[in-house]
Curated annotation (Swiss-Prot):
Family listed: Belongs to the universal ribosomal protein uL18 family.
InterPro entries tied to this protein: Ribosomal_uL18_bac-type, Ribosomal_uL18_bac/euk
Protein name per Swiss-Prot or TrEMBL: Large ribosomal subunit protein uL18
Function: This is one of the proteins that bind and probably mediate the attachment of the 5S RNA into the large ribosomal subunit, where it forms part of the central protuberance.
């Protein structure tokens, strides 16, 4: 990813996080790398992580060839929904961190919705 492209993504992410902070609800944040996918649920003020899931965890890795495809994103989405609900979080704002709502990001969001999270 070029520097300018990454700076633009971070600028979009900053704007989105500002709007989410004004809503006052928990935030489901996604980080995408070339090899893995990470998801975290933060408190409404962003000071504490309530739940987390990623493709490095053993329960997600089982049965996957790699952690960078949509199948892995679906597993992470279901797992983050399960963990957030166990922590008492039902409603979240989806923070895609400036990434396009497409591919792995969309697969994770759809799986989290199916898991019971409301965006």
């Amino acid at each position: 990813m070029s520097i300018n492209k990454n700076i633009a993504r971070l600028r979009r992410a900053k704007s989105t996080r500002s709007h989410i902070r004004d809503l006052g609800v928990a935030r489901l944040s996604v980080l995408r790398t070339g090899q893995h996918l990470y998801a975290q649920v933060f408190t409404a003020d962003g000071s504490k992580v309530i739940a987390a899931a990623n493709t490095l965890q053993a329960d997600v890795k089982d049965g996957l060839k790699n952690g960078k495809n949509s199948d892995a994103a679906v597993k992470v989405g279901k797992l983050i929904a399960e963990r957030a609900k166990a922590a008492g979080i039902e409603k979240v704002a989806f923070d895609r961190s400036g990434y396009r709502y497409h591919g792995r990001i969309k697969a994770l969001a759809d799986a989290a919705r199916e898991g019971g999270l409301q965006f």
